[in-house]
């Protein structure tokens, strides 16, 4: 407990006494190139692997031996001047305490499910690693969810526990009685709440002594809910192999991270990107994970952060770069920034060119899914081809295939596939939990069919051409139309609806709803009704899903069997009709 009293951060977060940070060169220690996390060849899979013990504890030992520089493992700030800095040894202490809270206080066991619904606060990382230490399967989710979304996820996953914040506790309480599996509710807050355990107090008083479970590499580690087109989100279950991927030399080459690097990734905490780019990848390299907690997106704050702190690796969806470019500057030089990455959306060639012209930096594109993690990428030193996402990353063999799983010739449009036979890649999702039919449906011959369309050139560069499903990609948020349509139809004005993506110069796509009104609402003011429907969707599901565009129609295009033809509506939006 002496250390916790000395290290005043998370519980009673201290105000930083340094308004001006030292120059980047003073903050970033020299690279300890002779050391690195345990690694294997690109296709060798160890029988046992647990990220907490094999990687985090490895770096903690290096710190103890004086063989890692002074950079923190974790560096968190917010707009109020609060700051948290943890070393790997301190992370080890805290996450072992968290592990004991889960197993001893909450009675959770290896294989149990725990819903993790936190914003970008330090506790998110403690919970994720604490779950790894105990073998508990954590289920990240965005904090933008509403009671209906939470109910669906808790019921489908049979989660025995949940960790969340004040703002969501009431939503959870409103549906908890319908979740028979839910036994433990942990609250991250400065205030108590009836029926909830105080996460921070429990961690303070927990023992720092804990033995990490022995995990098989193929034991389950995490579940991500991924948007569906004809139904609600599916559960993509991953093994510990997802956390092993950054240890492969071919993957390490992607960013060539060093212990001296400071990496900032702007990802929603519910995305797979957060688990990979703000946890397993940077910490595999022993570098600093930097987080600026932004309750509201603010382009100017992002620019100020990149100017103020020694961040040299930065990741954001392409719309973030477009928003930065819209700011009033002809050129800008970030003092420490060296590597910029993007994913989640297609990068326009003109944005790549403009970013380089105004910042002097290249923009490296990467591509992945909730089911796969990183599939392909461009990386430092690699030729950038505008319009192409890069080449396959180990351990994946990526090909463009037809509907039967046959590999297509170069520059031929087809389905982007990942080879799963004779050996399934260790970082590919295990299955859609509880849905063997959907799991089997995405297998196509010897390949996993991503559901995305693309083509590959003679050099192995992959071009993304679009989705073969109806998923809407708005600023990196993947939105299933069924979720929005289900929310809309709850309103008495909506007889039926169809939701598609509509092109947008900033967000890539926005949600557009085509709505057939019920007779009693036909004479209502359409502008007022649009606002009412938008607010309704925000109130019953995650606000980012609301339709920014609404068009009232007399009927929807349908097939002879009565199925709505969203592709016809998409053509209308893209001017193809």
Swiss-Prot record:
EC number: 6.2.1.2, 6.2.1.25
GO process annotations (BP): acyl-CoA metabolic process; benzoate metabolic process; butyrate metabolic process; cholesterol homeostasis; energy derivation by oxidation of organic compounds; fatty acid biosynthetic process; fatty acid oxidation; xenobiotic metabolic process
Family listed: Belongs to the ATP-dependent AMP-binding enzyme family.
UniProt keyword annotation of Magnesium present: yes
Modified residues (N6-succinyllysine): 85, 146, 183, 204, 237, 356, 391, 538
Compartments in which it is found: Mitochondrion matrix; Mitochondrion
Group of enzyme by EC: ligase
A Pfam family per the record: AMP-binding
Cofactors required: Mg(2+); Mn(2+)
Protein residues bound to ATP: 226-234, 452, 467, 563
Name by which UniProt lists this protein: Acyl-coenzyme A synthetase ACSM1, mitochondrial
Keywords: Acetylation, ATP-binding, Fatty acid metabolism, GTP-binding, Ligase, Lipid metabolism, Magnesium, Metal-binding, Mitochondrion, Nucleotide-binding, Transit peptide
Transit peptide: 1-31
Known function: Catalyzes the activation of fatty acids by CoA to produce an acyl-CoA, the first step in fatty acid metabolism. Capable of activating medium-chain fatty acids (e.g. butyric (C4) to decanoic (C10) acids), and certain carboxylate-containing xenobiotics, e.g. benzoate. Also catalyzes the activation of lipoate to lipoyl-nucleoside monophosphate. Activates lipoate with GTP at a 1000-fold higher rate than with ATP and activates both (R)- and (S)-lipoate to the respective lipoyl-GMP, with a preference for (R)-lipoate.
Binding partners and assembly: Monomer.
CC terms in the record's Gene Ontology section: blood microparticle; extracellular exosome; mitochondrial matrix; mitochondrion
N6-acetyllysine modification, residue list: 146, 204, 214, 356, 391, 531, 538, 549
């Amino acid at each position: 407990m002496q250390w916790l009293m000395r290290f005043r951060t998370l519980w009673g977060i201290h105000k930083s006494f340094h308004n001006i940070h030292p120059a980047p060169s003073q903050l970033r220690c020299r690279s300890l190139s002779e050391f690195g996390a345990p690694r294997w060849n690109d296709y060798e899979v160890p029988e046992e692997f647990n990220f907490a013990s094999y990687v985090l504890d490895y770096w903690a030992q290096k710190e103890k031996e004086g063989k890692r520089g002074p950079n923190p493992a974790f560096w968190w700030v917010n707009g109020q001047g609060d700051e948290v800095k943890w070393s790997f040894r301190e992370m080890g202490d805290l996450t072992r305490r968290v592990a004991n809270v889960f197993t001893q206080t909450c009675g959770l066991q290896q294989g149990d499910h725990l819903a993790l619904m936190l914003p970008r606060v330090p506790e998110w990382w403690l919970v994720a690693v604490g779950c790894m230490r105990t073998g508990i399967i954590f289920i990240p989710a965005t904090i933008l969810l509403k009671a209906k979304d939470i109910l669906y996820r808790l019921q489908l996953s049979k989660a025995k526990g949940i960790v969340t914040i004040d703002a969501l506790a009431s939503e959870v309480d409103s549906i908890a009685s319908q979740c028979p599996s839910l036994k433990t509710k942990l609250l991250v807050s400065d205030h108590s709440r009836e029926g909830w355990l105080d996460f921070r107090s429990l961690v303070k008083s927990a023992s720092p002594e804990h033995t990490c479970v022995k995990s098989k590499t193929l034991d389950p580690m995490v579940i991500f809910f991924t948007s569906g087109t004809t139904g609600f989100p599916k559960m993509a279950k991953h093994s510990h192999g997802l956390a092993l991927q950054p240890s492969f030399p071919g993957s390490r080459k992607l960013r060539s991270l060093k212990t001296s690097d400071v990496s900032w990734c702007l990802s929603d905490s519910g995305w797979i990107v957060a688990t990979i780019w703000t946890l397993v990848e940077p910490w595999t390299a022993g570098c600093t994970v930097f987080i600026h907690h932004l309750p509201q997106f603010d382009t100017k704050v992002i620019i100020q952060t990149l100017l103020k702190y020694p961040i040299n690796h930065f990741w954001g969806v392409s719309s973030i770069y477009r928003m930065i470019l819209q700011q009033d500057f002809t050129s800008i030089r970030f003092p420490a920034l060296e590597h910029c990455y993007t994913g989640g959306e297609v990068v326009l060639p003109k944005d790549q060119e403009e970013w380089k012209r105004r910042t002097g930096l290249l923009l490296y594109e990467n591509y992945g899914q909730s089911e796969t993690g990183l599939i392909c990428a461009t990386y430092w030193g690699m030729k950038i081809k505008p319009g192409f996402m890069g080449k396959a990353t180990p351990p994946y063999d990526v090909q463009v295939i037809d509907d039967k799983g046959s590999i297509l010739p170069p520059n031929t449009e087809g389905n982007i596939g990942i080879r799963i036979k004779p050996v399934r890649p260790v970082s590919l999702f295990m299955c859609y939990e509880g849905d063997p039919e959907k799991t089997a449906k995405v297998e196509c011959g010897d390949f996993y069919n991503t559901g995305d369309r693309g083509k590959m050139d003679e050099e192995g560069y992959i071009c993304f051409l679009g989705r073969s499903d109806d998923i809407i990609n708005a600023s990196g948020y993947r939105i299933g139309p069924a979720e929005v349509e289900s929310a809309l139809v709850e309103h008495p004005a909506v007889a039926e609806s169809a939701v598609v993506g509509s092109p947008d110069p900033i967000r890539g796509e926005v949600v557009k709803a085509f709505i057939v009104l019920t007779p009693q609402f036909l004479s209502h003011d359409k502008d007022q009704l649009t606002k009412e429907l938008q607010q309704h969707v925000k109130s019953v599901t995650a606000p980012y899903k609301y339709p920014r565009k609404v068009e009232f129609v007399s009927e929807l295009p349908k097939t002879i069997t009565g199925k709505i033809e969203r592709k016809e509506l998409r053509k209308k939006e893209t001017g193809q009709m």
